[in-house]
A protein has these predicted regions:
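Hydrophobic/aromatic residues in alpha-helical transmembrane segments
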Residues: 71-75, 123, 165-166, 249, ...
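A structural motif at transmembrane helix-loop-helix junctions in multipass membrane proteins
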Residues: 78, 84, 147-189
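Short helix-loop junctions at transmembrane helix boundaries
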Residues: 117-151, 164, 172-177, 220-229
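Selective transmembrane-helix segments that form parts of the transport pathway or gating/packing helices
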Residues: 98-128, 239, 243
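Transmembrane helix segments
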Residues: 177-212
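Transmembrane helix boundary and interhelical loop/hinge segments in multi-pass membrane proteins
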Residues: 72-94
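Transport-system extracytoplasmic interface segments
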Residues: 1-70
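Junction motif at the cytosolic side of a transmembrane helix
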Residues: 78, 169-175, 226, 242-265
């Protein structure tokens, strides 16, 4: 008998090679034995392994798409839309500091984007078994602990802040909402390509420096959480780096709010 773990790509590959070799050997011996015959269960993958494998491949990519779509629907309207309507001038003449205005914009847009992303995430979690054509007992979201969900929520939250910050800065350069949408397209392509990396390779990388790369760190952080292979220091690096990028983007946006050439063009 050949036992293997279908949730492990290396184990599955070795099983396929050995089964092929033994099948050929069996044929040369006039069918003296059969590989994995009978009703015994030879797949050693647990429900946790199966759930982790499928969720880690699909959900990081879907989450990034949902989060980006949610942020893209509101950020251009909030920045470029107000420039187009001329209402941004009312905000800029208030005694509020530009940095506070920029951070307020990012946080408020981030909350809306987060709610949009979470609603899409919950719907996807509930429908994924049917979408994958998998029996309901093969995947179970209850295999994840409260800690896993908290870490996932923190990664999602900081990712939304970075996304909103980047989209807000891009939108500030645009004169209209339509122009902002066109300028955002290259960033959308980059995020989509990065999101696909969750379906490639054999899990999240172990080296912490990968978790300093914007957007890629979030995808791999979510991948590690879903397949139970995450390291605490890597998740911390992901969260801290995202907060740093958010701070940098808010400072850039504040500088742009202080530029009449940009805001009144």
């Amino acid at each position: 008998a050949l036992y293997y773990n279908s949730a492990d790509t290396e184990s599955t590959a070795c099983y396929q090679i050995m089964a092929s070799v033994l099948d050929g050997y069996e044929a040369s011996m006039a069918n003296k034995f059969d590989v994995n015959s009978g009703d015994e269960e030879y797949d050693l993958a647990s429900k946790e392994d199966s759930t982790g494998q499928i969720f880690s491949m699909m959900l990081p990519m879907l989450l990034m798409i949902f989060l980006f779509s949610g942020c893209m629907a509101i950020a251009p309207e909030s920045i470029a839309g107000e420039k187009e309507r001329g209402t941004i001038a009312t905000l800029l003449v208030t005694p509020m500091k530009r940095g506070q205005l920029a951070m307020g914009k990012i946080i408020s847009l981030g909350i809306i984007g987060l709610l949009s992303g979470i609603s899409s995430f919950v719907g996807t979690m509930l429908s994924l078994p049917k979408l994958m054509g998998t029996e309901s007992n093969a995947m179970d979201a209850s295999v994840y602990s409260v800690t896993d969900y908290i870490l996932l929520l923190l990664v999602i939250l900081t990712t939304v802040l970075v996304l909103v910050g980047a989209l807000a800065v891009i939108s500030a350069f645009a004169k209209t909402v339509k122009e902002a949408g066109s300028m955002i397209m290259p960033l959308m392509v980059v995020v989509m390509v990065i999101s696909v990396t969750s379906m490639l390779g054999s899990g999240a990388p172990k080296e912490f420096y990968w978790y300093l790369i914007p957007f890629y760190n979030s995808v791999q952080g979510m991948t590690g959480i879903f397949d139970f292979s995450y390291s605490g220091i890597n998740i911390v690096a992901c969260l801290v780096s995202n907060l740093i990028y958010t701070g940098i983007l808010s400072m850039v946006l504040a500088k742009m709010f202080g530029s009449e050439k940009i805001m009144y063009s």
